[in-house]
Design a protein with these regions (language model features):
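Short, low-complexity disordered leader/linker segments with a strong preference
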Residues: 6-7
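Non-catalytic N-terminal regions of enzymes
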Residues: 2-3, 14-17, 23, 27, ...
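Acyltransferase donor/substrate-recognition loop-hinge adjacent to the catalytic core
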Residues: 305-316
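Intrinsically disordered, low-complexity regulatory tails flanking kinase catalytic domains
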Residues: 291-302
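A compositional signature for long Ser/Thr(±Pro)-rich, low-complexity
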Residues: 119, 123, 300-307
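Helical lid/core segments from catalytic subdomains that handle acyl or acyl-like groups
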Residues: 326, 335-336, 347, 389-473
């Protein structure tokens, strides 16, 4: 299955403007109800990136450690008192000494990386064969030799994006092993919910920002009677989801004495499309304003997110654990969606379907803005970054600046979004440059309406089929996982490959896709109605 014409990649990506788009992103002709909120320009740009900027203030760092940390441990880390810890190991890069934080060399981060500091990616994999922790540890140690920044700690203290990075201290990665005598493998939950977060060891974002916590954690839960759960977390500051997955692939290969088939990771941030040399912050802000990157002050942006039901959890602003819902779009329904839409590939059909279904089911008044945004990878192809680039290179692009009622059929939605997809891919290097400039200049301005995104009033569609199918290839010596639960990202519509069917032996991806819908809790009540689930699954209401 084709992941997308634009090779979508994961994470809370930022992107660039596809001017003024809707019916035609190429010629600029507006759609039937295309609307834009009033331009805010440079208003309050200095409010952007408030969390990162606080770390630059010594007294703020002290307050965070002395006052916030104890409360954070109580509210965010969850209960561990009932866990029976079997082992707790710190894994470090081999043949490398520990380095004092102040004197350790620094691996530079991009402005985009720094903007992603509060966010955490995670994945959970179920293994029917009990994992050999010794094999995991040896493989992880060998992999850290090629990914030394994951054994380091963030340093955000000095003002200026160019002064922030990862101190290569080799403090290491925690690998914890829990023995759960009451948990049987067959009783493991089949999707993310509040109970599945127990399989993860989060490094709370405050600790990560302070440089007090690891950038990657691994936790193994050994089940009663055999079987294991592997839960992993990685800070979004060091990479997006594609880099995350390729690291996991490298780990599993190293556990078997093999190298990653694509070679070694690439860390060089100068490969990312850059603003013009010598361009001042004021120049970048003027350029961004001309491109329509309208700044939103941090306080109202976060306030809107909290009002919509997002919560401050260890991996920053998310809708509550278990809020999202998985809907299976089987092979037959996916074929029907392609035929009804006239799409040239599955991603195009699913993008049109998800927008039209949400426009129907959210019960928003006709004419209400409901942008369609897709996520494009800056990697690959003749002009893209290397496939093994380890950093943030996924960009969110508004492929349809449209409103409820603009389109009445899948074919109309496809026609409306297609120019946006084409333009997004053709200009992805420019979009990546604008994204980098936005974070360097401290502007909370993106191609899409960030307030609408935070409030969940948008069709943010991230197709991760090809990338996260690789989770099923994570073989540490006893075979791949029987189920790999994908990251609980901020995506409103996240598309994954279908899970393996144990009854038929069908592998992952053989029976269509799984769509994960993650809207505000109040809206999710509407999505959970039986008729809404059938609509989202492509089993009814297709037109």
């Amino acid at each position: 299955m084709s992941a997308a014409p634009a090779r979508p990649a994961p994470g809370l990506a930022r992107g660039a403007r596809t001017k003024p788009s809707s019916r035609s992103a190429i010629d600029g002709t507006p759609g039937r109800s295309s609307r834009r909120r009033p331009r805010r320009g440079d208003l309050n740009v200095r409010d952007a990136g408030a969390f990162t900027k606080l770390i630059e203030i010594p007294i703020a760092r002290g307050v965070a450690r002395a006052a916030v940390a104890p409360a954070k441990k109580f509210f965010l880390d969850g209960k561990r008192t009932s866990e029976r810890e079997f082992a707790n190991t710190t894994v470090r890069a081999p043949d490398t000494d520990l380095a004092e934080y102040e004197r350790a060399p620094m691996q530079a981060l991009s402005g985009y990386d720094v903007g992603e500091v509060p966010f955490v990616m995670q994945a959970v994999c179920y293994y029917e064969e009990t994992l050999d922790v010794g094999v995991l540890e040896r493989g992880l140690r060998a992999t850290l030799a090629k990914y030394p920044m994951l054994a380091g700690r963030l340093d955000l203290r000095v003002p200026g994006w160019q002064n922030k990075g990862v101190k290569l201290t080799n403090d290491g990665v925690p690998l914890r092993v829990i023995a759960d005598d009451d948990l049987k493998f067959e009783d493991l939950p089949q999707d993310y919910a509040s109970e599945t977060r127990r399989f993860l060891d989060f490094s709370p974002w405050i600790d990560v920002m302070l440089g007090d916590a690891p950038l990657f954690t691994a936790k193994v839960t050994q089940c009663a009677g055999g079987g294991s759960v592997l839960g992993v977390c990685m800070s979004h500051a060091v990479s997006d989801g594609q880099g995350f997955i390729e690291f996991l692939v490298a780990w599993s290969k190293a556990a078997n004495g093999e190298a990653h088939p694509w070679g070694d990771p690439v860390f060089d941030r100068t490969l990312v499309s850059q603003p013009e040399p010598g361009q001042s912050v004021e120049d970048m802000r003027a350029m961004l304003s001309a491109e329509g990157f309208d700044n939103v002050p941090s306080v109202p942006m976060l306030g809107g997110a909290l009002m919509a039901g997002r919560t401050l959890v260890p991996d920053f602003l998310r809708f509550p654990a278990g809020n999202r819902m998985m809907v299976s779009v089987n092979t037959d329904n996916l074929r029907n969606l392609r035929e009804a839409s006239g799409a040239s590939n599955d991603n195009e059909a699913l993008s049109a379907h998800s927008w039209l279904a949400l426009a129907d089911l959210c019960e928003l008044p006709r004419g209400t803005p409901l942008e369609h945004v897709t996520v494009v990878s800056g990697r690959g192809g003749r002009t893209g970054l290397p496939d093994m680039y380890f950093g943030n290179a996924a960009i969110g692009v508004c492929t349809g600046r449209v409103s409820v009622g603009d389109y009445d059929s899948l074919a109309e939605v496809r026609d409306g979004l297609r120019p946006g997809f084409t333009k997004a891919m053709m200009r992805r290097n420019k979009y990546l440059m604008l994204t980098e400039a936005a974070f360097r200049a401290g502007v909370n301005g993106f191609d899409f309406d960030i307030m609408a995104f935070m409030q969940g009033q948008m069709c943010w569609c991230n197709n991760l089929v090809e990338i996260y199918k690789k989770l099923y290839d994570l073989d540490f010596g006893g075979g791949g996982p029987s189920l790999a639960l994908p990251p609980e990202l901020n995506d409103i519509v996240q598309i994954q490959c279908s899970r393996p069917d144990r009854s038929t032996g069908a592998p992952a991806g053989a029976n269509g896709v799984e769509m994960f819908i993650n809207l505000p809790p109040a809206t999710m009540e509407k999505m959970r109605r039986p008729e809404a689930i059938e609509r989202l699954a492509g089993a009814r209401g297709i037109r």
